[in-house]
C-alpha cells in the first residue's frame, strides 16, 4: 500500500494535495506552508508481509537466489536486487556451479571497498542442502590484507598462476591488475562485479572500459550485481550494445519487502529547514528508534564545516555524556528519560578510536543483540554493505547527489528483524536562501531531492504489466468485483507477485525481444534519466506555459531514442508510452489513494485501489490521456506544502531567470509529432487551436519553417 500523508502537527489535521494547475492559478496563495518544526509530506508504503523472502528451497536458496541460480548458465548475467536480498549468497551458488560444471578455472569477486569483502566469507552452504560449501582461503581475500589496492596486484598475478579457485579483491585492485596484465590474463575466469552501479560507459571510467574489453574479447564469464542500477551522475552504466548481451535477474523492492516476516511498513520523508541543522535534528529524530545518522560532507551546503562539533551538538541534543565503553568505544549518553543511549561515533578523526568502534559494529556475535548499539553517527561510512538489522531510521542530513547513495542508505534500514514492523528514511535538507552566493546550486539540490523521491516511489511500487484494451483476462489476476469486463479498461492484480496488469486504450506494444525486455525490466532506468534532467523538471514544475506532451512525448521520446538507438521507431514509441504510463499512473494512483481530487482524505486506500479508482474515474483510460498528465504536478504540490512561501518564490525566480526558448532539436521533435497528428486528423496542427498541445506542435512547424527560410541547416 503506497500512501502520501501530509500532517499539520499543531492540529493533527490531514491535508490533501491539489494538482499543480490549481496551484499555479494563484501561484503561492491559499496553501499551507510547513517547516521542519511541523510534520511534512512522506511516502508510506505498507507491504503484504507474507514471509516468502525468508523461506528457502531444498538447496538452501531464498526466492531471489533461486531465480538467479536458474540463469547460472548465462555468460553475462546482471542481478538487480535490493540491499539485504541475498545477492552475495546468490553469487556463491552461481560461482560454484561455474567452477564445477561450466569450465571456469577461477572465480574473482570484485567489491567497491574492503569492508564489503566480509560479505563473501566462508559459508556452510551444504548445511542447508547445497552440494558444497563456499570456502575462500585467507590469503586470497585481499580485502583483509594490509597495504594499498595497487600493492595487491602481484598477489592477483600469483592467484591467476596458481591452482586455487576463489579470490576476493576491491574494484581498484582489479583495475590495477587488468592495467598491468591485460584482459587476456583473465581468460576462462568468472569475474563478478559487486555494486555494479560503480561502472559507467563513460570512457574515463576505468572499470567500465575494462568491462567493455572483456565483453569484446568474449573469453570470460561476467556476473554483475547491484541493489540500484542507477548512477547519480545520470551516466549510462553500459553501452546499449553491451547491455543487450546481459541476461537479467530482477527482484524488486516490492517483492523483497512483501516477503519479509516482520517488517511491513517503510516511510520516507523529506524535511526542509532554515538555519543550522543541528538545531532541527530532534524534530525528526526519535531516540527510542535504532538510528543511523549520516551528517553532511564538509563541502555540502548543509555542513557547518566542523564535523566534530556537529557530532557534539547532536550528542548534546540527545542527552548528557556519561562515559565511554572501553571494549566497544561506544559513547554512553543519558537521555532526558534517564535511559542510557549507546552511541557509535564513526566521524571521530582518531583512527584508533574509529577502528575500535567500527570493529565493535562488525562483531558477528552481536548481530542479533538489539541492545548492542542505539544510534550510529557517520559521514562516509555505514552505507554500502553495512549490515545492522535493527536499524529503524536512516536519517540523512544534506542533499545526496546520487540516487544510488540514497537507495544504499535506505537499504540500511530495510533489514528484517524480530519485532521490527516499521522503518523510515528521512532526508533533512536546507531550504534555498536567496542571500546565499550559490543559490542556484541550492535550488538544483532541492529539485534533485524531489527527483529522488519520485524515483523511489517507482522503485518501491509493484511491477506494472501494461496491455491494450480488451487483451483478455490473465490467470491468477484479480479484476475486482464482477471480474474481467471486455467492455472497459481492466485493472488486475496478482496477489502473489504484487504485479498489476493494466489495460490502456491505444497503447503501443513492443514487438522485438529487446523492446519487450526493456518494457519489462528497464523502465526505471529511463525514468531516472527523465526526472534527473534539470530542464525537464524545471519546466514541469514551474513553467505554466509548458504543455505536458512536451515532456511526455517530446522529452521522453528523445531519451528513448538516445538510450536505445537500435530499436525501430515503432518500438521506441512503445517503450516511451510504457515509461510515461508507469510514472504518471503511480502519481495519479497516489493522488487517488490520499483523496487528492475530492479534498477528502481516504487513507485506507492502497496503491492498488488508487490505480483502480484512477482507471474508473476517467471515461476511458487511453494513452493520449496519460500523455496529457504533467508528471511533476504532484512533486510541485509536495514542494509547495513543505517549503516556506518566501523560499518557494525564490526558487521560482531562479528558475524563471534561466528559461530557454524553443530549440532546433525540440522543434524537430514537434514537427515529427505534427506529421503524426496530420495523419490521424487529416489536417495540420493550428496555431489558433484551443488545445495547447496542438498549438505547440504548430509552433514547432512554424519555427522550423523560419529556420529553412533563413537558410539554416535543419
Please describe what each predicted stretch is.
Residues 238-279:
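Interdomain hinge/linker at the junction between the two RecA-like core domains of SF2 helicases
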Residues 183-217:
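SF2 helicase catalytic motif II
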Residues 74-94:
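Walker A/P-loop
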Residues 94-119:
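Conserved SF1/SF2 helicase motif Ia
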Residues 82-84, 197-199, 214-237:
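Conserved helicase ATPase motor motifs in RecA-like P-loop NTPase domains
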Residues 351-454:
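Conserved RecA-like P-loop NTPase helicase motor core
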Residues 415-546:
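Long, hydrophobic alpha-helical segments
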Residues 82-83, 111-112, 117-155, 166, ...:
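Conserved C-terminal RecA-like helicase domain
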Amino acid at each position: 500500500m503506497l500512501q502520501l500523508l501530509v500532517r499539520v502537527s499543531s492540529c493533527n489535521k490531514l491535508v490533501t494535495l491539489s494538482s499543480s494547475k490549481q496551484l499555479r492559478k494563484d501561484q503561492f496563495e491559499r496553501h499551507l506552508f510547513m517547516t521542519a518544526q511541523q510534520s511534512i509530506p512522506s511516502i508510506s508504503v505498507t507491504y503484504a508481509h507474507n514471509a516468502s523472502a525468508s523461506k528457502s528451497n531444498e538447496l538452501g536458496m531464498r526466492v531471489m537466489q533461486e531465480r538467479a541460480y536458474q540463469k547460472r548458465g548465462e555468460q553475462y548475467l546482471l542481478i538487480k536486487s535490493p540491499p539485504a536480498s541475498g545477492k552475495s549468497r546468490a553469487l556463491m551458488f552461481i560461482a560454484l556451479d561455474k567452477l564445477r560444471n561450466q569450465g571456469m578455472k577461477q572465480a574473482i569477486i570484485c567489491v567497491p571497498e574492503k569492508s564489503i569483502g566480509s560479505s563473501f566469507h566462508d559459508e556452510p552452504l551444504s548445511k542447508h542442502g547445497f552440494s558444497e560449501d563456499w570456502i575462500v582461503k585467507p590469503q586470497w581475500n585481499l580485502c583483509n590484507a594490509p597495504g594499498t589496492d595497487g600493492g595487491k596486484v602481484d598477489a592477483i598475478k600469483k592467484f591467476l598462476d596458481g591452482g586455487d579457485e576463489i579470490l576476493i579483491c576491491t574494484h581498484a585492485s582489479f583495475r590495477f591488475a587488468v592495467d598491468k596484465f591485460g584482459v587476456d590474463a583473465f581468460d576462462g575466469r568468472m569475474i563478478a562485479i559487486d555494486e555494479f552501479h560503480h561502472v559507467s560507459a563513460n570512457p574515463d571510467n576505468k572499470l567500465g572500459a575494462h568491462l567493455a574489453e572483456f565483453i569484446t574479447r568474449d573469453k570470460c564469464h561476467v556476473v554483475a550485481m547491484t541493489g540500484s542500477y542507477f548512477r547519480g551522475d545520470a551516466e549510462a552504466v553500459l553501452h546499449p550494445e553491451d547491455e543487450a548481451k546481459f541476461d537479467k535477474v530482477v527482484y524488486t523492492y516490492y517483492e523483497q519487502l512483501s516477503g519479509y516476516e516482520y517488517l511491513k511498513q517503510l516511510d520516507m520523508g523529506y524535511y526542509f529547514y532554515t538555519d543550522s541543522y543541528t538545531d532541527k535534528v530532534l524534530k525528526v529524530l526519535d531516540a527510542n528508534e535504532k538510528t543511523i545518522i549520516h551528517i553532511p560532507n564538509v563541502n555540502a551546503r548543509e555542513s557547518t564545516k566542523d564535523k566534530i562539533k556537529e557530532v557534539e551538538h547532536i550528542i548534546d541534543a540527545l542527552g548528557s555524556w556519561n562515559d565511554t565503553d572501553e571494549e566497544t568505544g561506544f559513547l554512553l549518553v543519558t537521555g532526558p528519560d534517564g535511559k542510557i543511549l549507546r552511541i557509535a561515533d564513526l566521524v571521530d578523526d582518531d583512527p584508533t578510536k574509529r577502528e575500535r568502534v567500527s570493529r565493535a559494529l562488525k562483531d558477528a556475535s552481536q548481530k542479533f543483540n538489539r541492545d548492542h548499539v542505539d544510534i550510529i553517527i557517520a559521514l562516509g561510512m555505514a552505507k554500502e554493505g553495512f549490515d545492522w538489522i535493527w536499524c529503524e531510521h536512516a536519517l540523512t542530513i544534506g542533499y545526496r547527489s546520487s540516487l544510488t547513495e540514497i537507495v544504499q542508505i535506505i537499504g540500511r534500514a530495510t533489514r528484517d528483524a524480530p519485532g521490527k514492523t516499521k522503518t523510515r528514511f528521512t532526508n533533512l535538507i536546507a531550504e534555498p536562501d536567496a542571500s546565499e552566493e550559490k543559490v542556484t546550486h541550492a535550488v538544483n539540490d532541492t529539485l534533485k531531492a524531489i527527483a529522488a523521491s519520485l524515483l523511489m516511489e517507482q522503485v518501491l511500487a509493484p511491477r506494472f504489466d501494461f496491455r491494450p484494451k480488451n487483451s483478455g483476462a490473465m490467470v491468477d489476476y484479480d479484476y475486482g468485483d464482477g471480474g474481467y469486463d471486455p467492455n472497459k479498461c481492466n485493472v488486475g492484480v496478482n496477489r502473489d507477485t504484487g504485479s498489476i496488469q493494466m489495460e490502456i486504450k491505444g497503447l503501443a506494444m513492443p514487438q522485438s525481444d529487446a523492446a519487450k525486455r526493456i518494457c519489462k525490466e528497464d523502465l526505471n532506468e529511463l525514468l531516472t534519466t527523465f526526472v534527473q534532467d534539470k530542464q525537464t523538471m524545471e519546466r514541469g514544475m514551474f513553467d505554466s506555459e509548458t504543455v505536458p506532451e512536451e515532456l511526455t512525448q517530446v522529452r521522453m521520446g528523445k531519451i528513448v531514442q538516445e538510450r536505445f538507438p537500435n530499436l525501430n521507431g515503432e518500438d521506441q514509441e512503445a517503450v516511451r508510452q510504457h515509461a510515461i504510463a508507469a510514472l504518471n499512473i503511480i502519481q495519479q494512483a497516489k493522488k487517488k489513494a490520499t483523496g487528492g481530487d475530492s479534498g477528502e482524505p481516504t487513507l485506507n486506500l492502497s496503491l492498488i485501489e488508487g490505480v483502480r479508482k484512477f482507471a474508473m474515474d476517467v471515461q476511458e483510460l487511453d494513452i493520449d490521456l496519460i500523455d496529457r498528465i504533467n508528471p511533476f504536478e504532484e512533486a510541485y504540490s509536495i514542494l509547495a506544502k513543505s517549503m516556506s512561501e518566501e523560499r518557494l518564490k525564490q526558487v521560482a525566480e531562479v528558475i524563471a531567470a534561466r528559461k530557454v526558448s524553443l530549440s532546433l532539436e525540440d522543434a524537430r521533435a514537434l514537427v515529427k509529432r505534427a506529421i503524426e497528428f496530420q495523419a490521424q486528423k487529416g489536417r495540420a496542427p493550428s496555431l489558433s487551436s484551443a488545445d495547447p498541445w496542438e498549438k505547440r506542435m504548430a509552433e514547432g512547424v512554424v519555427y522550423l519553417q523560419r529556420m529553412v527560410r533563413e537558410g539554416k541547416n535543419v
